[in-house]
């Protein structure tokens, strides 16, 4: 096929683009919509999207009170002899009973001052305190093992593929309550 035949074929099948016509082809429309959609998304993301972490409390009143209560509990924990000072496994278990009771009292106090569970902050705090309850139960299991003569590593319950202390500590960090992290005294 020579050039003249090719030109005639284009005209006969109406395939020749008009030099002055841009045209709204489906591909162009889809492309423009995609670009506009991406631009709108990034505009929203930078200007109007919610800020902060999903676990961050809206009202800081609880976090201020909780940090104060947790700091008091940490001071009490520091008064208990360390594991290295324990004479034997029973002595270590006795130390852990004291520290676990301190933490249980702290959690009970935090629960009393927690926001209502019917609001978002209350739901978040309730889940966090439930994690504390799990951690305290793990400590009690460890105490029982020490009393039974088992000198094993302290293990905590897993949650979402990680130790229960990870979400517990993350919530405390996000809400600026560093004293409310797991103490690491075991």
Label the predicted regions.
Residues 1, 17-21, 57-63, 93:
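N-terminal capping/interface segment
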Residues 1-15:
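N-terminal intrinsically disordered, acidic low-complexity segments at the extreme N-terminus
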Residues 16-35:
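N-terminal export and membrane-targeting signals
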Residues 36-39, 135:
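Hydrophobic alpha-helical transmembrane segments of multipass integral membrane proteins
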């Amino acid at each position: 096929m020579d050039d003249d035949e090719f030109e005639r074929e284009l005209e006969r099948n109406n395939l020749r683009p008009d030099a002055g016509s841009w045209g709204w082809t489906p591909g162009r429309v889809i492309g423009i919509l995609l670009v506009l959609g991406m631009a709108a998304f990034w505009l929203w993301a930078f200007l109007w999207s919610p800020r902060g972490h999903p676990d961050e409390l809206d009202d800081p009143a609880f976090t201020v009170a909780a940090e104060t209560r947790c700091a008091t509990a940490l001071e009490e924990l520091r008064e208990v002899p360390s594991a290295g000072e324990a004479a034997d496994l029973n002595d270590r278990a006795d130390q852990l009973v004291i520290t676990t009771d301190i933490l249980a009292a702290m959690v009970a106090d935090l629960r009393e001052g927690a926001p209502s569970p019917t609001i978002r902050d209350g739901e978040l705090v309730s889940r966090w305190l439930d994690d504390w309850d799990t951690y305290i139960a793990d400590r009690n299991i460890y105490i029982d093992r020490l009393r039974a003569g088992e000198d094993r590593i302290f293990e905590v319950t897993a949650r979402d593929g990680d130790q229960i202390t990870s979400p517990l500590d993350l919530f405390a960090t996000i809400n600026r309550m560093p004293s409310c992290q797991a103490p690491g005294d075991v």
